[in-house]
């Protein structure tokens, strides 16, 4: 073989070795996919680099995601950004617009969600809650007197109103006894009074007659009711009773007048008058339209701020509980090596070819240098 043939032959051999070596090295990143054994011993370089280091790769990828990609700081920064808030507001407004078109009642929506008879449940909850609060108030303030419980300003205003109250009582009494019903009632009272007096009453009835006596008593009664001294007398009586009432503790008032039962009875009447049933019979659309301005301008922004604030403050603990590194590791472990190889080769196919060609070029250069040494020495 001549000098030129030797030179070309060694360049070709070197280039082929370099190209094949690099191509084989690239293939050995992924292949073989599993280990092969010969005489009970594992064949070297099986499985390929990535399949063999798969567990370590999955673990490192999980740590990389947690420590460098999905960090609490990065997510918080994204959550509090103006773009995120604007997007969240837009989504919320779209939801409100959608709800405003709904013909479903609140009751129907809750029943679809699994709550049976929501209006009854709401009334029962309110009743139970108010009972608990009232019992708590009774325990807390049962031994305190009314003057300790009622503010001084309120007591003073009530005391100032006593003359007005007594005047109102007397004026209503005058109007009643001037009416036909009042006159009849007064006549009946006089008749009953005389009957209880036996013979003396019969004698009075004999001389005057019931109607005549009622006609004589009524003007005097009205005169008495219109008298300022009567008003003052009634005011003084009311003030004295008010003064005594202020000294009563709630427990004493309960023993004397059954105050707790009266309060609970009043509570039941109020709750019956203000049942939640009409609210639950409203359609969601009606309620949304009625409060649309408050929902979009006040409640939605405030709710989003609270929601984002709550998420941000608890984000770190939530991410720790999620254990993202384990999730990433599990997903990488389950990901087929064949699919991973296909993805990497499809992305870096051109670069891998260039590496193969570079191996051939370097092998050719080495072959040329070797040919020079062979020819010269």
From Swiss-Prot:
UniProt keyword Cell division, yes or no: no
Family under the similarity heading: Belongs to the UPF0754 family.
Keywords: Cell membrane, Membrane, Transmembrane, Transmembrane helix
Recorded superkingdom: Bacteria
Record's subcellular location: Cell membrane
Transmembrane segments: 1-21, 357-377
Pfam families: DUF445
PANTHER family reported in the protein's UniProt record: UPF0754 MEMBRANE PROTEIN YHEB
Membrane-protein topology: Multi-pass membrane protein
Key word Transmembrane helix present: yes
Native organism: Bacillus subtilis (strain 168)
Protein name as it appears in the record: UPF0754 membrane protein YheB
Listed InterPro entries: DUF445 (IPR007383), UCP032178 (IPR016991)
A GO cellular component entry from the record: plasma membrane
